[in-house]
Amino acid sequence: MSILFISGTGTDVGKTIATAALASAFHHRGDRVIPVKPVQTGEPDGRGDIHTVEKLSGIRGVEFTRYPDPLAPNLAARRAGLPQVTLPDLAREIRDLDAPDRIVLVEGAGGVLVRLADDLTLLDVAAELDAPLVLVTSLGLGSLNAAELSVQAARTAGVEVLGLIGGSASPDPGLAEQLNHGELTRICRVPLLGVLPAGAGDLLPDDFQAMAQSCLTLPL
C-alpha cells in the first residue's frame, strides 16, 4: 500500500518515539502496519529502536542489520569488520514487506544524510523506492536551520517531505519553542503533523497509544 520513511534533523530528536506514535495512529485507523529499522547500531541484543517501537505501539517490527558500536552505520560496519549494507539489498528487503493492505514505516539512523554505507544515505533508499518522508525535528533554538537544511536535502534527492513532527516538546515551552511551531511550517513549506510531549517514551503502552491518536495528523 505505502512505504513511508521517518528521519530526523539529528540524533535524539525523538525519531523512534515518532515512529512508534505513527505506527499506533495508523493501527488505530485500521491499517496494517509494519515498522522497520534497516540498520541499528550501538545496542545489545534485545534492545534498540525497533524494540522501543514494539513496546510502545504493541506492533511487531523488523530489523535488518545490526552493528555493535554506537556510530554512523558505515563507520560501525567498518570498525566491526562487517559488510556494509547496499542499496539493492535494502530496497529489496523493504519492497518484500510492502503489500496492498499494509503501511511500511522505515526509521532511519540519525539525520537524513547519515551514511548507511560509505556512499549511501537514507534519502538514496527513499528515492530508489519513490517513497515519501516525514521529518522529526526538535523545536527549540537551532531547530529552524536544521529542519530547513534537512528538507532541502530531501527535495534535492527527489524525496517528497509530507510533514514535520516535533519531538520531545517541553511542558513549559520557552519563547523560541512557541514561535518555532509556525516558523517551521513557513520556512519548510510543509505541515506540522503534530508535537509529541517530552517523556512520551516513558508512558505505559495504552497511554502512549492514546497520546499518539490525539497528537498526530496522519500524513497518508
From Swiss-Prot:
Family: Belongs to the dethiobiotin synthetase family.
Keyword Glycosyltransferase assigned: no
GO cellular component annotations of the record: cytosol
The name this protein goes by in its record: ATP-dependent dethiobiotin synthetase BioD
Pfam families (alphabetical): AAA_26
Annotated binding of Mg(2+), by residue: 16, 49, 107
GO biological process: biotin biosynthetic process
Catalytic activity reported: (7R,8S)-7,8-diammoniononanoate + CO2 + ATP = (4R,5S)-dethiobiotin + ADP + phosphate + 3 H(+)
Subcellular location per the Swiss-Prot or TrEMBL entry: Cytoplasm
Quaternary structure and interacting proteins, as annotated: Homodimer.
Job of this protein: Catalyzes a mechanistically unusual reaction, the ATP-dependent insertion of CO2 between the N7 and N8 nitrogen atoms of 7,8-diaminopelargonic acid (DAPA, also called 7,8-diammoniononanoate) to form a ureido ring.
Binding site for ATP: 12-17, 49, 107-110, 167-168, 197-199
PANTHER family: DETHIOBIOTIN SYNTHETASE (PTHR43210:SF5)
EC number(s) per entry: 6.3.3.3
List of catalytic residues: 37
Record keywords: ATP-binding, Biotin biosynthesis, Cytoplasm, Ligase, Magnesium, Metal-binding, Nucleotide-binding
Cofactor section: Mg(2+)
Binding locations of substrate: 41
